[in-house]
Regions:
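Gly/Gly-Pro-rich "capping" loops immediately C-terminal to redox-active cysteine motifs
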Residues: 35, 49-85
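Flexible coil segments in periplasmic/lumen-exposed cytochrome c-class electron-transfer proteins
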Residues: 89-167
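Extracytoplasmic beta-rich repeat domains
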Residues: 190-203, 231-251, 279-294, 334-363, ...
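Electrostatic cytochrome c docking/interface patches
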Residues: 22-37, 88, 143
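Short, conserved, GDST-rich strand-edge loop motifs in beta-rich repeat architectures
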Residues: 304-317, 375-396
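Aromatic (tryptophan-biased) beta-strands that constitute blades/sheets of beta-rich domains
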Residues: 138-193, 227-239, 275-284, 328-336, ...
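Beta-propeller blade signature
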Residues: 269, 316-328, 395-409
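Sequence/structural segment immediately N-terminal to covalent heme-attachment motifs in c-type
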Residues: 30-48, 96, 100
């Protein structure tokens, strides 16, 4: 009995202390926590100010409140839990969804839900987002550095770029699998990837597969059996987007793997160990900048675009070239013609800060004979010309264009605008497949 009493007394004290907590104090803590979680999981689409972007509606203001007052704020909570984050519904605990819900209501000066969450529900207990395993990274013992010649003319058994060859052809010369034996193919191995939205093409070199997962996780696998050799998980800064949107490609060159991250940085990993070699911040993710595609190796320069450029800021959208050895930015080329530029008048009299868009959300291509990097740009933002103080006669260069860029200088050698003055969300930011004729 003495041993039982030893545990009962502290338990009674704990339960009594819980009852003495001030619900208002708990609610204030919830709103603070909700703000932090909103920044991490929601702000990329709905903005840090809750005013929305081209990718997510506004969560603040008269129209938003009137809509959900009619339906009931419980319906807002249910909708958020069932459909958010996109592609990762139910990612958070009930407690986290409630805290985000209360933060949104508080931001609209609306009474928040101060009801207690029932801790008998296991979903109310926050679970760590990281996978806990006993796995320890191993080292790729033998790996020959990837040369420019390899990049430009990859061995038939390797896939060294997003579409195998740097010209974007996406063609494999292998002939073992054909129309006669394809019916006999069988599953050799499978591997569960990290949850989330993904559109990646793995890279393969010397029997090693390099695979990027949602959440900016890169894995090195033995292509013969799927055995994990090493894994790198990018550590996001507080408040950055970690929704796990598409990371369409990574790049490989010499002894490094290159990845463009969700929080607008560029990193290089050691190809044998997966350890971080360098990191370069390209832009501030709090301004909306992010990556959904990665870099291309063009004549020894790591070239990549950026997106998330619908917000009104001075810098606008751009393409950068980086030194593969240390990540140093070699050049930066705007995809928006600014007022002082040669084609600045194609935006009418619009001030520089209001010239938005020109995102590059698909990787580029490269022609080593011409030494030109090709990439497509998306539309001007907002989509409707009149909302930008422009007309459809204002072509808004260099949006909806193909850009041909010297990868060593960043100079736009030539461009072609496919849809001048576009105003109905028809963009051309797709892959550029290069052919000789």
């Amino acid at each position: 009995m003495k041993n039982i009493n030893k545990y009962i007394l502290p338990l009674i004290i704990l339960l009594f202390s819980i009852q003495l907590l001030d619900p208002k104090e708990v609610l204030t803590q919830d709103i603070t926590s909700g703000e932090s979680q909103y920044e991490e999981f929601c702000s990329d689409c709905h903005s840090l100010t809750l005013r929305g972007t081209a990718h997510g509606s506004s969560l603040i203001g008269k129209q938003f409140i009137e809509k959900w007052e009619k339906r009931g704020f419980q319906s807002l909570f249910d909708y958020t839990k069932e459909s958010m984050p996109p592609g990762q519904q139910g990612l958070l605990s009930d407690k986290s969804y409630k805290e985000i819900h209360n933060y949104i209501l508080a931001s609209n000066n609306k009474k928040t839900d101060d009801s207690w969450v029932a801790f008998s529900d296991p979903n109310t207990i926050d679970q760590p987002n990281e996978r806990k395993t006993n796995f320890k990274n191993k080292v790729i013992k033998s790996f020959k550095n990837i040369s420019l010649e390899d990049i430009n003319n990859p061995p038939s058994s390797d896939w060294l770029s997003w579409r195998r060859t740097i010209d974007g052809q996406g063609f494999s010369p292998l002939k073992i699998i054909n129309t006669e034996n394809i019916k006999d193919l069988k599953l050799s191995w499978s591997l569960s990837m990290n949850e989330g939205s993904n559109q990646v093409t793995p890279l393969v070199s010397q029997g090693i597969m390099f695979l990027t997962n949602p959440g900016n996780i890169i894995q090195a696998l033995d292509a013969r059996n799927g055995e994990l050799i090493w894994e790198y998980s990018y550590p996001f800064p507080k408040g950055s987007r970690t929704l796990g949107g598409p990371t369409r490609n990574i790049a490989i060159y010499e002894d490094k793997i290159f990845m463009a991250t969700y929080d607008a940085s560029l990193i290089a990993l050691d190809v044998k160990t997966g350890k971080l070699i360098w990191k370069t911040k390209k832009a501030n993710f709090k301004d909306g900048y992010t990556h959904t595609s990665g870099p291309i190796v063009a004549n020894g320069v790591i070239v990549s675009g950026i997106n998330g450029c619908e917000r009104y800021i001075e810098d606008g959208c751009f393409i950068t070239g980086h030194d593969p050895d240390n990540g140093k930015e070699l050049w930066r080329t705007s995809t928006i013609a600014n007022p002082e530029d040669e084609y600045g008048d194609t935006w009418g009299n619009t001030d520089k800060v209001f010239r938005a868009g020109g995102d590059t959300w698909i990787p580029g291509s490269y022609d080593p004979d011409l030494n030109l990097f090709f990439i497509g740009t998306s539309q001007a933002k907002p989509w409707v010309a009149d909302s930008r103080g422009m007309t459809t006669k204002d072509s808004a260069l260099y949006t909806n264009s193909t850009l041909a860029i010297n990868p060593n200088s960043g100079k736009i050698v030539w461009f072609y605008q496919h849809i001048p003055g576009e105003t109905i969300d028809m963009e051309v930011g797709f892959e550029r497949v290069l052919v000789n004729y």
